[in-house]
């Protein structure tokens, strides 16, 4: 009897797992402001600027120390309440969850720690950019790779997609915005958050997707797609 394929859930973090995008929150409130950020996002969608360059402009406009930025995010950025039960269900079903983020790992783990607890926050799989904190408390992003995305999420997914059919897992991706463009075509099923830029991109490029509002929606859809008898 053939062994049942494992399911891998790849997910963006900011704006997908979180209710607010942490990088957008910093940029809008302590940097260039909402209008300028939205304009840069539109330029990324249009292809007139790379995500890497746009993101650098956004973060460079934020004048907070690392500690200040971390405290601001912990006070103001919440995680989708349905993510914790979703994640616990995934673990119970041997579903591998991998966070693919264009954000920065120290911020991500700190937010997870508030909502999942220290043990889960330290063990959850995260592939993301990092942070270099300077002696004076200032900080800068350290990109994951040299791509024009800064973190090309497709590079993590593709090796699994290229496995022989018998060894290839089922794969889904969950995302919301311009940082997810590189991953949008890489999995067999895509979940795109309602009202966000990723849907605009998918509609323009004719990429099929399922719309979601919370991880409760994704939970239900995964049960129908992969666990219905």
UniProtKB/Swiss-Prot annotation:
Binding residue positions for Mg(2+): 12, 14, 176
Subcellular location: Cytoplasm; Nucleus
Taxonomic superkingdom: Eukaryota
Active site, renumbered: 12 (nucleophile), 14 (proton donor)
CDD domains: HAD_Pase
Pfam families registered for this protein in UniProt: HAD
Biological-process GO terms, alphabetical: chromatin organization; DNA damage response; L-serine biosynthetic process
Coarse class of the protein's main subcellular location: cytoplasm
Catalytic activity: D-ribitol 5-phosphate + H2O = ribitol + phosphate; D-sorbitol 6-phosphate + H2O = D-sorbitol + phosphate; sn-glycerol 1-phosphate + H2O = glycerol + phosphate; D-erythrose 4-phosphate + H2O = D-erythrose + phosphate
EC number: 3.1.3.50
Molecular function terms from GO: glycerol-1-phosphatase activity; L-phosphoserine phosphatase activity; magnesium ion binding; ribitol-5-phosphatase activity; sorbitol-6-phosphatase activity
Keywords, sorted A to Z: Chromatin regulator, Cytoplasm, DNA damage, Hydrolase, Magnesium, Metal-binding, Nucleus
Family: Belongs to the HAD-like hydrolase superfamily.
SUBUNIT field: Component of the mst2 complex composed of at least eaf6, mst2, nto1, pdp3, ptf1, ptf2 and tfg3.
Role of this protein: Component of the mst2 complex which is a highly specific H3 lysine 14 (H3K14) acetyltransferase that functions together with gcn5 to regulate global levels of H3K14 acetylation (H3K14ac), critical for DNA damage checkpoint activation.
Name this protein carries in UniProt: Pdp3-interacting factor 1
């Amino acid at each position: 009897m053939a062994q049942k394929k494992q399911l891998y859930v790849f997910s963006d973090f900011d704006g997908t797992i979180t209710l607010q995008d942490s990088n957008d929150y910093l940029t809008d409130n302590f940097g260039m402001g909402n209008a300028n950020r939205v304009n840069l996002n539109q330029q990324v969608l249009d292809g007139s600027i790379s995500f890497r360059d746009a993101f650098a402009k956004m973060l460079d406009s934020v004048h907070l120390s690392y500690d200040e930025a971390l405290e601001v995010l912990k006070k103001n950025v919440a995680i989708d309440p349905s993510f914790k039960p979703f994640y616990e269900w995934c673990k119970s079903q041997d579903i591998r969850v991998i966070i693919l983020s264009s954000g920065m790992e120290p911020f991500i783990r700190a937010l997870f720690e508030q909502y999942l607890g220290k043990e889960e926050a330290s063990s959850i799989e995260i592939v993301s950019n990092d942070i270099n904190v300077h002696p004076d408390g200032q900080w800068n992003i350290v990109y994951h790779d040299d791509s024009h995305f800064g973190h090309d999420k497709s590079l993590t997914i593709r090796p699994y997609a290229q496995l022989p059919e018998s060894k290839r897992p089922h794969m889904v991706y969950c995302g919301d915005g311009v940082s997810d463009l590189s991953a949008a075509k890489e999995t067999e099923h895509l979940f795109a958050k309602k009202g966000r830029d990723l849907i605009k991109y998918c509609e323009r490029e004719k990429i099929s997707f399922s719309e979601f509002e919370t991880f409760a929606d994704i939970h239900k859809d995964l049960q129908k797609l992969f666990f219905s008898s």
